Amino acid sequence: MMSSNELSQEVIDLINRQATIVVVATVDEDGSPRTAPFGWVYARDSKTLRFSTSRGHDTYRNIVRDGRVMVCLMEEGNTAISIKGNARVYKEQLESVSRRIAMIEMDITYVKSDVTRVASVISGIKCKINKEYVEMTEGVYTEMMI
């Protein structure tokens, strides 16, 4: 895969396995890039990504003000992908959680492989959901899949 305007089925499956961490880049008020890791991410289809975040998070505020977003996905198997698009608040408050969690929807405009011949990606970002957040995480994913 060189570049495209949509996700391949392989990338959709990788994102939707619910163990994938991506890095989301947004634009701060002063024009600087702002990055943050996200685990609550779901590929709704080949042209749409959803992710959820706290309404108090910088990423949320940046998307409300300026919807330009870039998502970086790196995973084992030499996967390195940049996903560019425009994001907006799709749902201000998730019904499945009591915390202030919003769902963001991103319309994908560009997808490209960032694999290099110099080095191979052997692992993505790994994390483990803390026990007290497992139920909330399940609710977030259930809602993002609707």
Annotate the PLM regions.
Residues M1-I146:
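Binding-site signature for planar aromatic cofactors or substrates
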